[in-house]
From Swiss-Prot:
One of its GO terms (biological process) is mRNA splicing, via spliceosome. It comes from Arabidopsis thaliana. Belongs to the SF3B5 family. Was originally fused with At3g23315 to form At3g23320. This is Uncharacterized protein At3g23325. Disulfide bonds: none annotated.
């Protein structure tokens, strides 16, 4: 692999990380990674009507109520963030 290839790959990766929030970066904590996964999952459930219907039937709720519940869960999907240790 040549130096120009490595530069091209790194610049493409930086572009993706700047464009899409969930792609992560080197300083991403475990909590932030988990939050991204949970939010992506909830967004997928809301966006795919059959999956949303499945959850609504399983929980005996209306589809609108399930959509609302999932959007509320997207705010803090994993609870409050842990305390940061200042260095």
């Amino acid at each position: 692999m040549q130096a120009s290839d490595r530069f091209n790959i790194n610049s493409q990766l930086e572009h993706l990380q700047a464009k899409y929030v969930g792609t992560g970066h080197a300083d991403l904590s475990r909590f932030e990674w988990t939050v991204n996964i949970q939010r992506d999952s909830y967004a997928s459930y809301i966006g795919h009507y059959p999956m949303l219907s499945y959850f609504a039937i399983a929980e005996n709720e209306s589809i609108g109520r399930e959509r609302y519940n999932f959007m509320q869960k997207m705010l803090l999907p994993c609870g409050l963030p842990p305390e940061r240790e200042d260095e």
